């Protein structure tokens, strides 16, 4: 029939036929109830109102999007983490086994996926575990994976596990184990527990951190004859001054502490020992001239007898 400029067909999406079988149900212009095909798309009405969300019809479950269109040929993750698959005609698999994209699944009497298996939705991988979408660290077939709070799998990145151990999630999601690997130009070794075992720099969440004994290093660390100070979260100090144990240090843009050189900070002059600590309450002779550094490590000026070049006349 033609009604209000729309081509309407009345019936239900069929499991064996994409076209509905017309029932004895009567659809009125106002107050219609049941399935209606409008311009080739199926919608479900109750008392004239287009429905959304979960609907049950003839013992089968359907899910209707916000615009009333029904899900078909796709997975859906419900708000409680349960997982469903909707067939080509819209109904969810019910109390059966099915093979989808090469993987086997079991569906219960409530249409939910049973057991554990991977699913691909919107180009992302999800792990169904005991019938629910898994989150956090998971183990599958002896490999470790990390799943976001929405269940999607992470890959191509460094992550810390719940014990603070460092792991690298490769392109297919599993953490490297029992092998060596070159990542972003740096070499790493991973043990059978998927923990990085050698001391090496990593980039995690856009920040440089140092892997040491399988965990993120903190505090003072030495690498390639340079000293670094790593904060409690493992990030390194850079482009800043720092006082530790009453000693003053300055860090360059790449994180190493300046050493054996002059440093000017906020208009004050400092000179740094080989370990990066600024001179303090002591004399320095350099270039044949003497300089005095005060308790705050700044070079003394004006309050002592200094020459035009800031050198002390100490003999």
Regions found by a protein language model. Give the residues of each.
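Extracellular adhesion/carbohydrate-binding repeat motifs centered on closely spaced tryptophans
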Residues: 1-315
């Amino acid at each position: 029939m033609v009604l209000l400029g729309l081509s309407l067909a009345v019936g239900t999406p069929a499991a064996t036929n994409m076209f509905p079988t017309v029932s004895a149900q009567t659809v009125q212009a106002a107050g219609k109830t049941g399935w209606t095909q409008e311009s080739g798309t199926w919608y479900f009405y109750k008392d004239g109102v287009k429905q959304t969300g979960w609907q049950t019809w003839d013992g089968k479950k359907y899910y209707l999007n916000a615009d009333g269109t029904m899900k078909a040929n796709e997975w859906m993750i419900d708000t409680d983490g349960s997982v469903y698959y909707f067939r080509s005609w819209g109904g969810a698999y019910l109390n059966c086994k099915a093979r989808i994209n090469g993987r086997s699944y079991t569906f219960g009497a409530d249409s939910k996926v049973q057991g554990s298996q991977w699913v691909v939705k919107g180009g992302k991988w999800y792990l169904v575990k005991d019938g629910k979408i898994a989150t956090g660290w998971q183990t599958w077939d002896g490999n470790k994976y990390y799943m976001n709070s929405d269940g999607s799998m992470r890959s191509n990145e460094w992550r810390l596990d719940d014990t603070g151990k460092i792991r690298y999630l490769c392109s297919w999601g599993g953490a490297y184990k029992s092998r060596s690997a070159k990542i972003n130009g740096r070499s790493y070794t991973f043990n059978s527990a998927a923990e990085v075992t050698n001391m090496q720099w990593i980039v995690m969440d856009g920040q440089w951190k140092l892997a040491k004994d399988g965990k993120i290093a903190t505090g003072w660390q030495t690498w390639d004859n340079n000293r670094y100070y790593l904060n409690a979260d493992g990030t390194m100090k850079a482009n800043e001054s720092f006082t530790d144990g009453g000693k003053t240090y300055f860090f360059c843009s790449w994180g190493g502490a300046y050493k054996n050189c002059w440093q000017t900070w906020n208009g004050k002059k400092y000179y740094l020992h080989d370990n990066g600590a600024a001179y303090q309450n002591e004399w320095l002779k350099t270039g044949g001239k003497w300089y005095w550094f005060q308790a705050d490590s700044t070079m003394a000026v004006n309050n002592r007898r200094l020459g035009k070049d800031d050198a002390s006349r100490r003999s």
